[in-house]
Structure formats: C-alpha cells, structure tokens
Amino acid sequence: DKQWIKKNSLGENVLYNLESLCEIMEFKEGMRVLDLGCGKVASAIFLAKEFGVEVWAIDQYITPSENYQRIKEMNCEHSVYPLKLNAKELPFPAHFFDAIVSVDSYMYFGTDEKFTPYISQFLKPGGTIGIVDICFSKEINYLMEVPEFMREHYQDKWYFVHSLDWWNKLWIKTGHLKILNAEIIPQNEFIKKEYVEDFKFSKKSDAIADALAQDKDGLINIFRMTAQRSEKPIDLGNYCMEV
C-alpha cells in the first residue's frame, strides 16, 4: 500500500532504501534481526512479512504502543517487537542477533568510533550488519568547504554526514567487522528525485529536500554498506558508550 508506506516513513520512502539493502543481504526464515532506528516500523514489518524473520524494532522517539498498533494492523504482532530504546543503551545479550539493519538513521548514532565494536557485540560471529543512509561524494572537513545552499542548516542537519570512504574506514578500524559491500545504491538518482518531488507535491518544508533540489554537483548521495561480524572477541570495558 503506497499511501501506508508514505504515511509511515520518516522522510523518504523507507522501503526504497530497504529493498536496496535486501538485494545484498541474506535473510532466512526464523532469523533474529535488530532494526536500529526503526521509525514507524515500516521496515521491520516488511522484513517480517517478506522473509519470515523475527524483528526487534527499536526507536528512541516513537512509542512502542504507537508502533504496536501499526504492527497489529499488518498482523505481525508475533514477529515484530517494538521497543523504545537508545541505540547506545541496548539490553540484549551478546551474539543474540543473526543480522542488524538500519535504514535512514545510522548516521545519528553510529559515527562514534566506539559504537562499531559496541553494536557488533550483539551479532553472532558470521552475522551481518547492513545500513542505508545519506553520504557525501567527498568528505567535508571544514566549515569553509560547505556549499552555500547547505550552510543555513549545516550545524543541525549535515555536520554528521560523511563520505562513503569515511564509513568504510570506520567499520574496519577495530577488526570486528569485515566489509562485504560499500557503494552508492543503484537507485540513488531515482530516490533523490522522488524525495524532492514528494515534498514539492505536499508543499511541506524539508531541509534535506531543499538541499537535494539545489545540489547540482551530486554532493549528496545514498549509500548502502554491509559487513560480516568477525570472530575477534570484544572487550566491552574498552568501549563504554557515552549517551
């Protein structure tokens, strides 16, 4: 249901990006999946219905009761479990999940260097993590490098956005993850265009849509990245998270 998806997406159509991730990740019936920053659970519901997996859907801002209503509407109450949690304060045991996904939200909590080993602890060795998010075509290191069209909202919308190369280096730094795939998604131009058109049609203001409309040099893009959990042990005493 296209209208249901739009209604339950925070920003662009979340399933466009999730489907791109599913092209390069393997999900099997009965797997335990963690959906980080699930928003209004559209992604978690899709995974449960499409692949028969169990999904722990966490978000810091959307209430579990609100998400549970959506889950019941789609008859997924026995396979999608909504929780209100900070991504840096998770209660799960080590090696609990077969896969971790994050669609359009990882950059809000995953740029901390300590977060990579922290989140990796919840994956079984050999398990996979996959994200889809916004990136820059080149790294912006100084405020003077920020394009004019982006400067008004840079400090609240863009300063934590990085290049694909930056993300690649972050994930391999501690040896707990082995990169399987890191690239701009094939649907990049289509999804960006749809995002701009959706907000133009709705006549709502959105800083990201406004920036995309003015980005003539292709600075802003959407990437997908997957990695496999290595066998390397994780000593969490070295990776205490600050929340």
Regions found by a protein language model. Name each.
Residues 34-36, 40-89:
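Class I SAM-dependent methyltransferase SAM/SAH-binding core
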Residues 113-128:
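A short glycine-rich, Lys/Arg-flanked "PGG" loop and its adjoining helix->strand segment in the class I
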Residues 181-243:
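Conserved Class I S-adenosyl-L-methionine
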Residues 159-175:
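Short alpha-helix
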Residues 99-111:
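A short SAM/SAH-binding and catalytic strip from SAM-dependent methyltransferases
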